[in-house]
From Swiss-Prot:
NCBIfam families: PRK00132.1 (NF001099). The gene is rpsI. PANTHER family: RIBOSOMAL PROTEIN S9, SMALL RIBOSOMAL SUBUNIT PROTEIN US9M. InterPro entries: Ribosomal_Su5_D2-typ_SF (IPR020568), Ribosomal_uS9 (IPR000754), Ribosomal_uS9_bac/plastid (IPR023035), Ribosomal_uS9_CS (IPR020574), Ribsml_uS5_D2-typ_fold_subgr (IPR014721). One of its GO terms (cellular component) is cytosolic small ribosomal subunit. This is Small ribosomal subunit protein uS9. SUPFAM superfamilies: Ribosomal protein S5 domain 2-like (SSF54211). Keywords: Ribonucleoprotein, Ribosomal protein. Pfam families: Ribosomal_S9. GO terms for biological process: translation. Gene3D superfamilies: 3.30.230.10. GO terms for molecular function: RNA binding; structural constituent of ribosome. The keyword Ribosomal protein applies. It comes from Nitrobacter hamburgensis (strain DSM 10229 / NCIMB 13809 / X14).
Length: 158
């Protein structure tokens, strides 16, 4: 009886050791950059960050040129501002697919993930701000017998 109790205690100790949250480690390549992929709607962004002067390049162009609307530039800066790291990292990203709004959201998502790869201690702040969550909303498909996804054709009674 005591053997089974002892083995149960060992088993429960093993289970609690396994269920601990995984420790997030720093993931940096040989060039000192952290990499992550971000997605939003149809857009996919590949983002690399490294310590620097705060320069942001999107598809080999300055962020002010690529994203002309101030709202989109502000969206991209949000993770850096929330983590109090604005102007401390150089960001290089390539983004494809979707429109400008989706692309800005994809860059923001990728930048947040890259920041957590570079500094794992920022994960809590970024998670609380909702920057690490993939926005799963995508365009609803068009249905047959309808003008659009939900819009019906005009109905005439007579």
């Amino acid at each position: 009886m005591s053997d089974t109790m002892q083995s149960l205690d060992q088993l429960s100790a093993l289970k609690t050791a396994e269920s601990e949250a995984p420790k997030h480690t720093k993931k940096i390549d040989k060039y000192g950059r952290a990499y992550a992929t971000g997605k939003r709607k149809d857009a996919v962004a590949r983002v690399w960050i490294k310590p620097g002067a705060g320069k942001i390049l999107v598809n080999a162009r300055e962020v002010e040129v690529y994203f002309a609307r101030p709202v989109l530039r502000m969206m991209i800066q949000q993770p850096l501002v929330a983590a109090a790291r604005a102007g401390q990292y150089d960001v290089v990203c390539t983004v494809a697919g979707g429109g400008l709004s989706g692309q800005a959201g994809a860059v923001r998502h990728g930048l947040s993930k890259a920041l957590t790869n570079f500094e794992p201690e920022l994960r809590g702040v970024l998670k609380k701000g909702g920057f690490l969550t993939r926005d799963s909303r995508v365009v609803e498909r068009k249905k047959y017998g309808k003008a659009k996804a939900r819009r019906s054709f005009q109905f005439s009674k007579r």
